[in-house]
A protein has these predicted regions:
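Helix-turn-helix DNA-binding motif, specifically the short coil turn and the N-cap/start of the second
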Residues: 46-47
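Hydrophobic positions on the alpha-helical face of helix-turn-helix-like DNA-binding modules
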Residues: 39-40, 50
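Intrinsically disordered, low-complexity basic tails/linkers immediately adjacent to helix-turn-helix/homeobox/MYB/SANT
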Residues: 68-94
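Helix-turn-helix DNA-binding elements, focusing on the entry/boundary residues of the two helices
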Residues: 36
Length: 117
């Protein structure tokens, strides 16, 4: 998973645990694509102050993930669902009659689960 996607997912999962300023600066920098200078100017603080808040926010998000592991579990479930989907597709292709119907139903349920993750 690329670094930007990881940061965004961690923020979505644990962002409420950050301070208000950390949340705000993180969001503005990564989600709104504002530069440190733009944020600093609008907030009336130094670029270094903005960067320190963003860095502390990232560290807090990573520490929280290390302790709780929601993103790791999400990724594991997503990989397992993809593997099950592939196996179910193979099963559908190999079976006929009632077994084929069961395999198709299984594939449909796996796909629904996968899209719900």
């Amino acid at each position: 998973m690329d670094e930007q996607l990881t940061r965004t997912m961690l923020f979505d999962l644990y962002g409420d645990l950050l301070t208000k300023k950390q949340r705000e600066y993180f969001h503005l920098h990564y989600n709104e694509d504002l530069s440190l200078s733009e944020i600093a100017e609008s907030e009336g603080i130094s670029r270094q102050g903005v960067w320190d808040n963003i860095r502390r926010a990232e560290e807090a998000l990573r520490r929280t993930e290390e302790k709780i592991g929601l993103l790791e579990r999400y990724n594991a479930q997503k990989a397992a669902a993809a593997a099950m989907e592939t196996e179910a597709e193979e099963l559908v292709a190999l079976t006929e009659g009632r077994a084929g119907e069961i395999a198709e139903d299984l594939l449909r349920r796996i796909q629904e689960l996968k899209h719900g993750i």
